[in-house]
Amino acid sequence: MTDLNLPSIFVPLVGLLFPAIAMVSLFFHVQKNKIV
């Protein structure tokens, strides 16, 4: 794997991973506090 291919794989991974972690943490936070 060259340095040119690394960003093209890294950017979508971070772009999908960050919102996923944010939604999961928010979901568990709501479940724990019973805001719903």
From Swiss-Prot:
Question: Mainly resides where?
Answer: plastid
Q: Where in the cell is it found?
A: Plastid, Chloroplast thylakoid membrane
Q: Quick one: a GO cellular component term?
A: chloroplast thylakoid membrane
Its BP terms in the Gene Ontology are: photosynthesis
List the keywords (alphabetical): Chloroplast, Membrane, Photosynthesis, Photosystem I, Plastid, Thylakoid, Transmembrane, Transmembrane helix
Q: Does the keyword Mitochondrion apply?
A: no
- Regions that span the bilayer: 6-28
Give the bilayer topology.
Single-pass membrane protein
What is the annotated signal peptide range for this record? none
Sorted alphabetically, which Pfam families does this protein's record hold?
PSI_8
Matching entries from PANTHER family are given as: PHOTOSYSTEM I REACTION CENTER SUBUNIT VIII, PTHR35775
Role played: May help in the organization of the PsaL subunit.
Give the family, as the similarity comment puts it.
Belongs to the PsaI family.
How is this protein named in the record? Photosystem I reaction center subunit VIII
